[in-house]
Amino acid sequence: MFAGPYGLIYDYSIERERLMRAVGRAVWGIDMSVLYASMEVTGRVTDGATILDVPCGGGVAFRALRSDQDVRYIAADLSEEMLARARRRATQQSLSRVEFAVADMRALPFADEEADLFLSYNGLHMLDDPERAVTEIARCLKPGGELVGTSLLAEGSWQQRALIGIGRRRGFPVPPSRRNLRRWLTATGIAEPEIEPDQGLAVFRGHKKQTED
C-alpha cells in the first residue's frame, strides 16, 4: 500500500517494535503493542490452513510464522517495492513456503472462500473506498474463517486528529470511523466483529458466519 519514501519509513519503523511503540505513544497517542500482539495468531493456526496476508507490506506479520509450519501462506501487496522487502524478510526467517502476489485489496485475485485466516494490517485506512476492500476480504474467507487486522480510525487522540488533517491536505484518505468499520464487517458476514481497544488504532477481528444448510 505504500511506495517510495513513505514505504521506506513505514517499513523501517514497523519492523522495530520498541521504536514503533515509542513513536505511537509520543506522536499518535496510541498503544502500538496491540498490533504486534494480534500477529501471534499466525503461530496458532492448524496444519493445512491457508493464510492470506493483504497488504503484507514488508512482511511484518511473518514474525510469528515458523519455518516448519504446515500452512499455505500467501503474502500480497499492490506495491512491488513492498513485496521485494517481504521476500527478503521471508529469506531472513527461512520461510521458503511463503507465496507472493501483486494484489489490490479492492479486487483480490483469490478464489471465493479460499482463506482460513485473513490478515490485513494497516491497509484499510490507506484506501478511498475501504468498504469495497472489506467486501473482498469477506468473499475470500471460508465460512468459519478468521479475520484479524488493524486500521487507524477517524476517532482518536488530538495528535492523531491533527496528523489526519495534515495527511488529508497531502492527499491521504481519511480513516474509517469505528461505526462504519463495524457496519461494513457485519454487512459482509463477519459475525459480532470486535474492534478494540478504544483508541485511534484498533485491532478488528471476527469469524465469517457459517453457511446455513
List each model region and its residues.
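Class I SAM-dependent methyltransferase SAM/SAH-binding core
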Residues: 50-107
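Conserved class I S-adenosyl-L-methionine
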Residues: 1-45, 64, 148-170
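A short SAM/SAH-binding and catalytic strip from SAM-dependent methyltransferases
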Residues: 117-129
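A short glycine-rich, Lys/Arg-flanked "PGG" loop and its adjoining helix->strand segment in the class I
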Residues: 131-143
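Core SAM-dependent methyltransferase catalytic element
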Residues: 189-213
